[in-house]
Amino acid sequence: MHNQAWNILLTTSLTLTLAATAEAQTARPARYADGVYTATGEYGGQPSHITVRVTLKDGILAAVTVTPHAYVPRSLELQRAFAAAVPKVVVGKRIDQVRVGKLAGSSGTPRGFNDAIRQIREQAARR
């Protein structure tokens, strides 16, 4: 009788543990909706801007493209360098943890990028 009671207790405990684990994994909906999002980030006094396009999957940046819009040659050069460098830094990271500082010699363009990412977070947020 003792072994039978022990087996029932063990089986019940295992069943409850598995059920609790499954519930914990499915109870929390994703914070951001998967999809492709685009936003234009502003920065500087002129103002300057860049367009940022991201593919979001499970809250993680799967792809990032930055389109420069500067017309002053030096500014365009900095925006292009930033656009080439930023995917290597942010792809694979959670969107809610992405914030870029000076990168590829540019200190202004990251502000525009961060502004665009903020807008994209708002677009993708599940309400």
Show where each model-derived region lies:
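Bacterial N-terminal signal peptides that target proteins for export
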Residues: 1-10
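Bacterial N-terminal signal peptides
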Residues: 9-17
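Short acidic/polar alpha-helix capping motifs at helix-coil junctions
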Residues: 16-21, 63-66
